[in-house]
Amino acid sequence: MVFAWLGPEGGEPPALPALDCFVAPASHSFAFKGMWQCNWLQAFEVGIDPVHTSFLHRFEHDEDGAETRKAYGRQFRAPSVGDVDGERWPMTRVMREVCSPEIRHETVMPGVTRLTTLRLINERLTHVRITHALFPCTFVIPLSPTMTITQMHLPIDDTHTYWVSFFTSFAGPVDKDTMRAQRAATMTMPDYIPKKGQHNDWGFDAEDQRTRTFLGLGE
């Protein structure tokens, strides 16, 4: 990722924002990019929308222990953090059963908004999700309890957008080979064109919709 100063020649460029992905050691961060067939603003908006996950990423069944252990690098697979009396919901269940959360927003500083999403599970347990929107084109969202995604959206034209994601681990070093393989499998190289799109109904599968996911679009 290359950042350019486009201000007056000889001017002093501002420092990069103090985002986790820019201060983490190289061993704990990983970057990848792709292309979406949509406007950059659509890509930015859906990333900060905490409710779309209950539909676009909704699985009708929870994974068992063996499958959960394979959750590395995949969204909404790891168990949520915290439990009460031994009850700890997997993220698939949180997203599936609590689809109308309370959403709060506040301005942290000019151009930066914090969104807090509260999903009431029971009288003693509430799932809290924190995301940040850095206008005009960046958001920071959780991937798992120990990893975040900082994603930027770069317009190509009105209907095509590059996304660049920085994954930051707050636990051990990032397994970059696994992360790269997971994402490379969804697109063609070296042009980064997604394998699923309007040309093939985004991979819609009626059987998948009947038995596994809300929209029938797989992972």
PLM regions with names:
Residues 3-219:
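C-terminal catalytic domain of Rieske-type non-heme iron oxygenases
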